[in-house]
From Swiss-Prot:
Pathway: Lipid metabolism; malonyl-CoA biosynthesis; malonyl-CoA from acetyl-CoA: step 1/1. The keyword Nucleotide-binding applies. This is Acetyl-coenzyme A carboxylase carboxyl transferase subunit alpha. The keyword Magnesium does not apply. It catalyses: N(6)-carboxybiotinyl-L-lysyl-[protein] + acetyl-CoA = N(6)-biotinyl-L-lysyl-[protein] + malonyl-CoA. It comes from Neisseria gonorrhoeae (strain ATCC 700825 / FA 1090). The gene is accA. Belongs to the AccA family. GO terms for cellular component: acetyl-CoA carboxylase complex.
Length: 319
């Protein structure tokens, strides 16, 4: 797959194109230009490190939405075995913006749930661009209650612009579905591990992101509203999105400092989409450690700790 570069990555794109051209020349002729290719490759890596070491919140927001980032089904394929997808909320329909089912993680049975976006136009429409309707959240809850019934840990992957705001979704109880999930997740009697892998958009993300551990990939975001949406409300123009992103505190590092996130999972140089394999290794290592910790804690203590964690949201001290 040909890499897609964001606006601020154009200097990297130019170097990458030069490297590709030189590789083509080397393949088609007897001229040895491998040293020049290596020099440009090192220059490209150094430039990428330089650019990504000083990303603004607005730029991180762009990376979190990168069209080539791994989605939930990519993580399921890489981290789990024997995945059996389950469909429908048993009330209205099957929402393809939420995927989930039974699987094995390191041989242990678990339930996995997550948002799913599409790669091409047809799939994006089918997945509703990763924006669940009420039936998606009710499907997620059905799967999590199944996990509770059989004593299976729950692992969720969050990547959504937000819950779908359509009229039909509102008529079918979008806010009720989200609120019900929040309530049930606070008292679910099994370990719950949540990982933000891309966009963590408002209540649409929170409905599957209440757990014993909340992780974020290094270049993912988590906020009550998108920077563009916030700018449109406050300044009446999306051109102020960069200012909004800064004010919202949407980045993983910022949220970890506020004790809203447990672990920031390091991404490969250039973002998760640059190296799926390394991204999966990094995520797996964190989930393995957290699952072991959660299962070593007595259930009553686990639930008490989860409740205390939620009650601590929003606390602050004046200095």
């Amino acid at each position: 797959m040909k890499p897609v570069f964001l606006d601020f990555e154009q200097p990297i794109a130019e170097l990458t194109n030069k490297i590709d051209e030189l590789r083509f020349v080397q393949d088609e002729s007897a001229v040895d230009i491998s040293d020049e290719i290596h020099r440009l490759q090192k220059k490209s890596n150094d430039l990428t490190k330089s650019i990504f070491s000083k990303l603004t919140p607005a730029q991180i927001s762009q990376v979190s939405r990168h069209p080539q980032r791994p989605y939930t089904l990519d993580y399921i394929d890489a981290l789990f075995t024997d995945f059996e997808e389950l469909h429908g909320d048993r009330h209205f329909a099957d929402d393809h913006a939420i995927v989930g089912g039974l699987a094995r993680f390191n041989g242990q049975s678990v339930v996995v749930v997550g948002h799913q976006k599409g790669r091409d136009t047809k799939e994006k429409i089918r997945r509703n661009f990763g924006m669940p309707r009420p039936e998606g959240y009710r499907k997620a809850l059905r799967l999590m209650k199944t996990a509770e019934k059989f004593g299976l840990p729950v692992m969720t992957f969050i990547d959504t612009p937000g819950a779908y705001p359509g009229i039909g979704a509102e008529e079918r109880g979008q806010s009720e579905a989200i609120g019900k999930n929040l309530y049930e997740l606070t008292r679910l009697r099994v370990p719950v591990l949540c990982t933000v892998i891309g966009e963590g958009g408002s209540g649409g993300a929170l409905a599957v992101a209440v757990g014993d551990y909340v992780n974020m990939l290094q270049y993912s975001t988590y906020s009550v509203i998108s920077p563009e949406g916030c700018a449109s409300i406050l300044w009446k123009t999306a051109e102020k999105a960069a200012d909004a992103a800064q004010a919202l505190g949407i980045t993983a590092d910022r949220l970890q400092k506020l004790d809203l996130v447990d672990t920031v999972i390091k991404e490969p140089l250039g973002g998760a989409h640059r190296d799926f394999g390394q991204t999966m290794k990094n995520v797996k290592a964190v989930l393995e450690k957290q699952l072991h910790e959660a299962q070593s804690i007595p259930l009553a203590d686990l639930l008490s700790r989860r409740f205390d964690r939620i009650m601590a949201y929003g606390k602050f001290s004046e200095q």
